């Protein structure tokens, strides 16, 4: 499906799962004004083709703790090998191959020992690596789990929003951790499927999930190729912002509908933003019309050629094609 654009209903279904990845088909159907059978059939097709996958994400604070943004320059012809080696690591949830074929961008979440071994020993000892830089995440303004594609009306989004956390995160036992691990693979698994996977009664699983949700630990992320939503360009923007304006600029960008990540970082650039655009002209307009008035000192634009892994999910993508046709599917 990578050479096609999703139709209106499929885009709305993706947006619904961006709001609540565990929303029941009946609830989605009521909000969108279609039948539950249609929702079930459409979602099954999207998931079967790999166009859509929903996973559990750690809390923003948990994800940011100790996170590094890696930029790895490699010899030409070696970018695939390095990208897939990084993607094979469970502590590296995001991996992109950048345009030009000599840079891999990745996010690493790990304890200091594992992180330092990769940055200080493994990458420098790899013959195909020319240079590697690591930038610590200092603050998260927004991340991929909060991005909304924007095809739902405000009242539809509000109707799908899950209940906010009502308790502090609970202490986790082995069963909790196993449930969260299962949801990290597929956040839409039914209570019955989860019960079978962890070897616990379904009633116990329901109670545990309710407890985890109340503690804010069931945050989900709908992974979808943005090209299927008509966004053919994905770019990392490394920004140099005057320190006195860093918070203001970060918050402004975090509220922009095309931005799917904004992080304050260490290194030469103190802010990194990730942005989806319909095309290169759209990226130019974003740079001139959105970034231009913000008083940013310098912008380095790195365009993603191919996403290899997103939110812990390996992708089967290929370079963005020149054109696509809408998917026509009956309701």
Where are these regions (language model features)?
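A compositional/biophysical signature of low hydrophobicity enriched in polar/charged and small residues
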Residues: 1-331
């Amino acid at each position: 499906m990578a050479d096609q654009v999703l139709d209106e209903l499929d885009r709305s279904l993706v947006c619904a799962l961006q709001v609540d990845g565990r929303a029941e088909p009946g609830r989605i159907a009521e909000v969108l004004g279609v039948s539950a059978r249609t929702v079930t059939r459409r979602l099954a097709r999207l998931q079967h083709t790999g166009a859509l996958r929903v996973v559990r994400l750690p809390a923003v604070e948990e994800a940011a703790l100790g996170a590094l943004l890696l930029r790895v320059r490699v010899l030409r012809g070696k970018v695939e090998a390095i990208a897939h080696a990084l993607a094979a690591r469970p502590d590296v949830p995001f991996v992109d191959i950048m345009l030009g074929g000599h840079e891999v961008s990745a996010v690493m979440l790990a304890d200091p020992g594992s992180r330092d071994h990769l940055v200080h020993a493994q990458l420098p000892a790899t013959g195909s690596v020319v240079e590697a830089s690591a930038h610590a995440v200092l603050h998260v303004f927004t991340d991929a789990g909060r991005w909304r594609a924007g095809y739902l009306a405000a009242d539809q989004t509000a109707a799908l929003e899950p209940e906010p956390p009502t308790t502090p995160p609970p202490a986790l036992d082995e069963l909790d951790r196993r449930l969260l691990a299962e949801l990290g693979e597929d956040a839409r698994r039914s209570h019955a499927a989860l019960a079978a996977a962890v070897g616990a009664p379904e009633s116990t699983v329901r109670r545990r999930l309710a407890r985890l949700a109340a503690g804010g630990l069931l945050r989900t992320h709908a992974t979808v190729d943005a090209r299927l939503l008509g966004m053919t360009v994905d770019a990392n923007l490394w920004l140099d912002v005057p320190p006195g304006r860093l918070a203001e600029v970060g918050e402004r960008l975090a509220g922009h509908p095309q931005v799917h990540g904004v992080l304050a970082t260490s290194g030469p650039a103190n802010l990194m933003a990730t942005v989806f655009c319909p095309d290169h002209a759209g990226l130019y307009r974003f740079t001139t019309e959105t970034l231009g008035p913000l008083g940013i000192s310098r912008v380095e634009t790195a365009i993603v050629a191919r996403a290899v892994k997103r939110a812990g999910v390996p992708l089967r993508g290929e370079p963005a094609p020149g054109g696509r046709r809408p998917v026509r599917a009956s309701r």
